[in-house]
């Protein structure tokens, strides 16, 4: 268990004030920054996992207590760490993302909480491009077979021509707020894909993403995809 001195979870405060919280991922560990609404002065807690590359930290909005952290560790490689007390204590998850084939997870880049009606569900995106799901609050992870073992995956992911794992990754995972089975993912060296059946099947949705070299709907290279909060 990795223990840290950290501020307790935010408490209810008067409506006229608010607390700003930033979860910051760096090559030297993770940090949590706090400030008021003026943001002139900041408190900082961390680093968490000093000496590890932290790719992503995210607070679960469904309980406002749980934080998941994707890190590249020197001893165990790509791992996910979990805190259920807002960063005061961290533990590695029991079963991190792992491919069922000879392909190996090089990095874990993205962590996304599931739909609000599924408080136990999380998603993770990796390099090389892989999509994983947890149904036990992030403790154990399994492949989303409809994507990872899709017969068209090589066609989707190898149009850019790079072999660098630094670039080949799933960096964006979105769940429709009104439909937990509606998923959108964004990939570097791949593009944007949509599933309407919980990840069992996927359709490219790259029309409108401009490129000079590719004429079909595959092989785009977005670096981030986000949902509009009012019109997902």
Segments from the language model and where they lie:
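Extracellular glycan-interacting surfaces
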Residues: 1-232
